[in-house]
């Protein structure tokens, strides 16, 4: 992966709907060359998909929460299909610490969140944090360009 690939990835993370012509202008290549690079990045599993970013509140999902869960490893085969089928689960991560699972969920109301937590508790103890506000929304991975890498190396 070179600096052009990193620039293409950064641009696509900014807006996955940028036209090829715009991307090509930004990286000083032809549209077919950019298309070939994007296809290679997809084939290599670096670009894994394209998604619309939506406002959950505008869609009626006023409650975002993080739920920690203690899960016995023997329950994983039963738990993973269950949680995968729950449309309100935005993320499910295996984590270190007192709890083994961290879920990010969105619900229209605290009553629906409470019902979901009740179902989760068949798998283990939970701890829930409701989000009041988000200072840094989900964003892409920052890929330093060569100039930044050189600057960092010089400052060390």
Q: What do the predicted segments below correspond to?
A:
Residues 1-156:
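A compositional/biophysical signature of low hydrophobicity enriched in polar/charged and small residues
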